């Protein structure tokens, strides 16, 4: 069994904002190494229930072993958290007391060479979080049009050299398919002028991020998962999301603000006719970040941003 050595970020902050209590029902939509899940179970003892989602079967199995001491207080679901409403309905749960989404790729997935998430090692260009899914990064790289490749790399990677990288990919794949991570890295390095390489950022970072997001439909999943999670919250229940790059954080911020907004009528209309009521109260005006102590012991936490809401 793969050992998911994943250090959970912002552990104290997650518990403070989620505020688990005995008897509560909580969803960890991104179970991963089960670090946050264990904290939630301990805080909601003796009878709190945790439903853990992960589309990565390897992660789910490993988490199941780690959480075995909690027995029937844990329910595992192999599914993307975007479908949490449907999945919970299937097991008869209509409302929850809280949910957590810690989005993005896990340290273990990056370190598992054969998964193809990392540009540091040579491996098949895969990047699927759900290994039963059909589309791999290699398929996108070798089949998308130059225009679509450019759009994916620019929008999901926020890469200024997207057009040039897409053009170089097309040229290379006309000679031979791009099948491995390092083959793609070579193309990207050739496309991005050396003078534009950033000191602390590998030139392939943004393109690999973009492809991973596209392969796993991460942004749409986040938006759907957040909205679905809020709908399931009981009054006073809380939702917490941790993101690691600006695209994810922007979605969390926008979604939560929209759900917290009341009347959406134009200002020139003196009386509300839309009937829209706020669903949540935003608990974090600005995103919560890791302190210096955590960053020094877990550098990955440096880019973590936590936002939270409470159902009203």
Swiss-Prot record:
Its main location: cytoplasm. SUPFAM superfamilies: Putative methyltransferase TM0872, insert domain, S-adenosyl-L-methionine-dependent methyltransferases. Its EC number is 2.1.1.199. It is found in: Cytoplasm. One of its GO terms (biological process) is rRNA base methylation. The keyword S-adenosyl-L-methionine applies. S-adenosyl-L-methionine binds at residues 34-36, 54, 81, 102, 109. It catalyses: cytidine(1402) in 16S rRNA + S-adenosyl-L-methionine = N(4)-methylcytidine(1402) in 16S rRNA + S-adenosyl-L-homocysteine + H(+). GO terms for cellular component: cytoplasm. Keywords: Cytoplasm, Methyltransferase, rRNA processing, S-adenosyl-L-methionine, Transferase. GO terms for molecular function: rRNA (cytosine-N4-)-methyltransferase activity. The keyword Manganese does not apply. Pfam families: Methyltransf_5. InterPro entries: RsmH (IPR002903), SAM-dep_MeTrfase_MraW_recog (IPR023397), SAM-dependent_MTases_sf (IPR029063). Belongs to the methyltransferase superfamily. RsmH family. Specifically methylates the N4 position of cytidine in position 1402 (C1402) of 16S rRNA. This is Ribosomal RNA small subunit methyltransferase H. It comes from Geotalea daltonii (strain DSM 22248 / JCM 15807 / FRC-32) (Geobacter daltonii). The gene is rsmH.
